[in-house]
């Protein structure tokens, strides 16, 4: 519950919820939960691609790459959002201003923004792509992260952020995926939009 309001967080299609009752899941939930608290945020749940989650639990792979995290800022937990539309547009404007800071706003089309961020990102850092889409139910932004791993070498990851309002509470839905191409990124964005639609349907 968020500030006394009960909110349902259904896992996206093909994803399964991490459970505190499973040791591997509990470790991840605890670690990501602690990282969120350091950013003055609260993690409410995580889900991952079902097959990746099963393999991870069996010790056959590292943490699933395809994940969804549901969280909010601690300030948002008690705040009642009177106008969801205004809240979303304000948050999107803040993200657009951040894009201006990094120069990504000067690039007109989304695919070029993504490819530019991938070209510029350094190892063990991240590059802000900018706002990817906005409508009355959510604002969507992206960043590209490149990490060096001991076993798999350099891995480039996509991190999509969506900001929405459920039952007058501001919620962040993060979608993590391996980066493969700009077109594949737009597919992941489409799936995240489906996740947001399902969240709204579950919390009418």
Spans of model-derived segments:
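Short N-terminal segments immediately surrounding and downstream of signal-peptide cleavage
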Residues: 1-14
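Second-shell loop/turn segments in exported
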Residues: 5, 73-82, 177-186
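Stable alpha-helical elements in mature extracytoplasmic
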Residues: 11, 83-87, 91, 188-195
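Primarily extracytoplasmic ectodomains and periplasmic/lumenal surface modules that are beta-strand-rich
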Residues: 13-27
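Solvent-exposed loop/turn segments at secondary-structure junctions
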Residues: 16, 146-152, 178-181
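Conserved polar/disulfide-associated segments of primarily extracytoplasmic proteins
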Residues: 30-150
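Short, surface-exposed beta-strand/loop micro-motifs that present aromatic residues
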Residues: 155-166
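Surface-exposed amphipathic alpha-helical segments
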Residues: 168-204
């Amino acid at each position: 519950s968020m500030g006394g309001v009960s909110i349902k967080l259904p896992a996206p299609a093909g994803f399964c919820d991490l459970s505190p009752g499973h040791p591997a899941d509990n470790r991840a939930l605890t670690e990501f939960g602690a990282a969120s608290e350091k950013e003055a945020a609260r993690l409410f749940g995580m889900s991952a691609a079902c097959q990746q989650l099963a393999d991870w639990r069996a010790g056959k792979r590292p943490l699933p790459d395809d994940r969804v995290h549901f969280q909010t800022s601690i300030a948002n937990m008690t705040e009642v959002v009177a106008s969801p539309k205004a809240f979303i547009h304000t948050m999107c404007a803040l993200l657009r201003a951040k894009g201006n800071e990094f120069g990504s706003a000067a690039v007109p089309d989304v695919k070029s923004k993504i490819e530019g961020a991938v070209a510029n990102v350094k190892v063990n850092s991240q590059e802000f792509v900018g706002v990817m889409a906005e409508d009355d139910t959510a604002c969507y932004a992206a960043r590209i992260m490149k990490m060096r791993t001991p076993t798999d070498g350099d891995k480039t990851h996509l991190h999509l952020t969506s900001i929405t309002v459920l039952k007058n509470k501001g919620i962040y839905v993060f979608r993590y995926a391996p980066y493969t191409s700009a077109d594949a990124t737009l597919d992941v964005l489409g799936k995240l939009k489906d996740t947001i639609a399902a969240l709204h349907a579950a919390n009418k």
